[in-house]
Amino acid sequence: FYVHGAVFAGWIGLLLVQTSLVAGGRTDLHRKVGALGALLAIAMLILGTVGALIAARRATGFVGVPVPPLQFLAVPLFDMVLFPAFVALALSYRRRPQYHKRLMLLATIVLTTAAIARWPGVLELGPPAFFGLTDLFVVALAIWDRRVLGRLHPVTLWGGAALIVSQPLRLVVSGTDAWLAFARWATGLLG
């Protein structure tokens, strides 16, 4: 799990480097570094998925989570669907900066839920706390759009809505027989 943490922290570092390169007018270098970012995103998808499956198989489940592990598995696995979807869309919109940067930001916001849930006291408050605090980043982006563009950018509207709608959907899906059967099957893939 240390590798997982280092790689995911690397994504945050990459985001800072990439935004600094663009702000400094070095879009040529930004594009080159972006290719490494795509590889990093693939590594994150693999590590995030495998890490979640391993945690769900442990007798203790997810550290500090008072929910049965197979049920809670929906939370990180939905992240591992949204994150690469936002990254793939961002890469497809490389030539449209307003779309690209918002999609990359949304991909990063997806990752913050796990980090926020680890803050002292947050996990004990349940999903409204860790999802709600994550959603504040989407709200900040929406406020930025309204102030700068005078309207919500379509990526902010639809991407933010997809992220926010996925949160209660995870909770509803996670308790179903179909989800639990899938979770048993998925964790069984590890051997």
Residue ranges, per PLM feature:
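Alpha-helical membrane insertion/targeting regions
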Residues: 1-191
